[in-house]
Regions:
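Cationic-aromatic interfacial patches
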Residues: 1-60, 67
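Bimodal feature
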Residues: 50, 64, 176-178
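Extracellular-facing segments of soluble proteins and assemblies that are Gly/Ser/Thr-biased and enriched
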Residues: 58, 63-153
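Residue-level marker of positions within ordered structural domains that often coincide
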Residues: 78, 183, 198
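Substrate-binding/catalytic groove segments of enzymes
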Residues: 82-85, 175, 184-189, 202-204
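...with weaker cross-activation on analogous glycine-rich loops/strands in unrelated enzymes
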Residues: 129-187
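Low-complexity, Gly/Ser/Thr/Pro-rich intrinsically disordered linker/tail segments
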Residues: 189-241
Length: 241
């Protein structure tokens, strides 16, 4: 099942329209693990779900402590462009400021992350899914909430849309991504959030801890902060790609 097929919207709300093939459409159609299955840490252990998450996105995270909060968002964004074959759009800044480009990686270049970072030619051109995930692993290691927040642009709550991110850069920082949204006749929005966290773990659909009656849906009506199960975000921390 997907986010869209597993979760109904509350009475009085309708899912916002999205363009077929858009990033919003891609997020809404993320495949979920069978209901009740736990999110797994990179070491194979299960994460407790009670009060934290309701479903788990079926994502392979490997056996290293890499796929944390910002990494999950960078991966899902990169996966979107990878399946569209828009490889030149798969690039991320390291904390150092170095821009890691998948278009260079598939030409056989590799990255020396020391100092300000540099490319060096190592192998023949190749563009397999394994190549893509190897590239993303080095991104996970040298990019994070600090660099991602700087790369993104401020977004107003009025213009909030699927694919936007609440992010606080830091060590540690945190980030959650809006993966679905609905609104009522008054134009009031509700939305669904996904996250990974520390240590590396599969991406989860979060429960609303402030209003259990809402299940996995969040509303900012009357709120001054966004309260999620494992982090509180000032509302001005909303960003867009």
């Amino acid at each position: 099942m997907t986010i869209e097929t597993r979760y109904n919207v509350p009475a009085g709300y309708k899912r916002v329209a999205v363009e077929n093939g858009s990033f919003a459409d891609f997020l809404r159609k993320q495949k979920l693990k069978p209901y009740g299955e736990k999110a797994l840490y990179y070491n194979g252990q299960a994460k407790r779900s009670e009060g934290v998450y309701d479903s788990v996105i079926n994502v392979e995270i490997g056996d290293r402590d890499l796929h944390q909060c910002a990494d999950a968002i960078m991966l899902i964004r990169a996966e979107y462009f990878y399946q569209k074959k828009e490889y030149d759009k798969i690039n991320f800044n390291f904390v150092s400021g170095f821009n890691a480009q998948y278009s260079k990686w598939i030409q056989g270049y590799r990255i020396n992350p020391n100092g300000k970072g540099s490319y060096y030619k190592k192998t023949s051109p190749s563009n397999t899914y394994k190549d893509f995930r190897s590239f993303m692993n080095i991104v996970f290691g040298y990019a994070g909430t600090l660099s991602m927040e700087k790369e993104m642009k401020p977004q107003s709550l009025e213009n909030m849309k699927i694919g936007d991110v609440f992010i606080m850069g830091g060590s540690p920082g945190h980030a959650v991504i809006i993966v679905d949204m609905a609104e009522n006749d008054k134009g009031e929005k509700i939305f669904m959030l996904a996250q990974s966290y520390m240590p590396a773990q599969q991406t989860q659909i979060l429960i609303n801890p402030a209003d259990r009656n809402m299940g996995v849906w969040y509303s900012l009506k009357g709120k001054t902060v966004l309260e999620t199960p494992e982090w509180r975000f000032p509302l001005e921390k909303l960003r867009k790609f």
